[in-house]
Amino acid sequence: MPSSIDTIFITHDHKDHISALNVFLKKYNPKVYMTSKLKRALDNKINIKNFVPLESDFTLEDLKVNVIKTSHDASDSVGFVFESGKSSLVYITDTGYINVKYFELLKNRSIYIFESNHDVEMLMNGKYRYDLKVRILSDRGHLSNDMSSDYLVSLIGKNTKYVVLAHLSEENNTVEKAYQTLVNKLEINHIEDKKILVASQSEVMNMIEI
């Protein structure tokens, strides 16, 4: 139930990530965690009454939250590593690359929710304007299927149970391409099968328990 949601984490201010926030906050009053820079960018758009600054790692009850700076053409953008006991989850989407300084923190986590935005060939042969294609491929754009899979091959470990490929472009990707790219790279690198799921933009996934 929406009323049971007491905490929201905002990664960045692009419309596809915050379009429902204003409506939700008119009816409910959860704590909203975001960076101060991002809050300032949204002040004229959304009335956030219960704002909590998100500037560094912290603990929320029994949940440790690590903040990862991502590289995206937004007012500010972040990803997260959530830890509770022996379980952990990485959430990274909307980034052109991942800074190497975070690699050790990101390794061998239980679940990865990871951007696999586009197939480069589909993007370059598609109908997007050239400047938009350049933006998507830039260091402040999005991870392609190949980039995402390369990162995941170097990060996942024996404790990893699930990989969820997320933020797929409906114009420049397919579920099959994203999935098969990762499967192929896991096989090449002799990494045992993990449970690989692909998130849909229009359908809610089942709950994952670890």
Residue ranges and their predicted role:
Residues 35-41, 54-57, 201:
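Short, polar loop motifs at secondary-structure junctions
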Residues 14-18, 40-42, 74-75, 98-100, ...:
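Active-site environment of divalent metal-dependent phosphoester hydrolases
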Residues 49-51, 65, 196:
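Generic structural signal for residues in well-ordered beta-strands
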Residues 19-28, 43-45, 173-180:
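Metal-dependent catalytic neighborhoods of phosphoester/phosphodiester hydrolases
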Residues 1-34, 38, 110:
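Active-site metal-binding motif and surrounding structural segment of the metallo-beta-lactamase
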Residues 100-199:
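Cap/insert and terminal regions of metallo-dependent hydrolase folds
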Residues 194-210:
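Short, basic/aromatic-enriched C-terminal tail that caps enzymatic domains
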Residues 1, 19, 53-111, 208-210:
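Core dinuclear metal-dependent hydrolase active-site scaffold
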